[in-house]
């Protein structure tokens, strides 16, 4: 691409989904319990507009849980936080969290995997 060229994203129906990718610090030794809560099957999340919710670990960071979420909209994500099932999971997980959190939030504008 020439210097100074402008990139114009192609707009499609799947565009403008909302992504939240984050890390959750777990109390030492409690990571696996936290993962159990986060991976519990939830039809409520899907109904609320969650397209993807992946939970992962990395043995090099034994007290960290990684989460990648894809939502239909930022509003769908925010609304999901008010669901009774989500509030219950948050309350259950809270004692397992160290308070260390990080991550990124962004709206998707394209992908090389789709037209």
Go through the PLM ranges and name each one.
Residues 84-89, 93:
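Long, charge-enriched, surface-exposed interaction segments in small proteins/subunits
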Residues 4-65, 70-84, 98-115:
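Short S/T/G/P-rich N-terminal loop/turn motif that feeds into the first structured element of a domain
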């Amino acid at each position: 691409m020439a210097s100074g060229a402008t990139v114009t994203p192609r707009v499609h129906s799947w565009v403008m989904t909302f992504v939240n990718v984050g890390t959750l610090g777990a109390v030492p030794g409690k990571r696996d319990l936290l993962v159990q809560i986060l991976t519990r099957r939830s039809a409520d999340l899907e109904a609320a507009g969650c397209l993807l919710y992946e939970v992962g670990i990395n043995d090099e960071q034994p007290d960290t849980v990684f989460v990648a979420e894809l939502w239909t909209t930022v509003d769908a994500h925010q609304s999901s936080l008010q669901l009774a099932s989500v509030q219950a999971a948050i309350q259950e997980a809270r004692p397992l969290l160290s308070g260390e959190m990080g991550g990124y939030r962004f709206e998707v504008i394209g992908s090389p995997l789709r037209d």
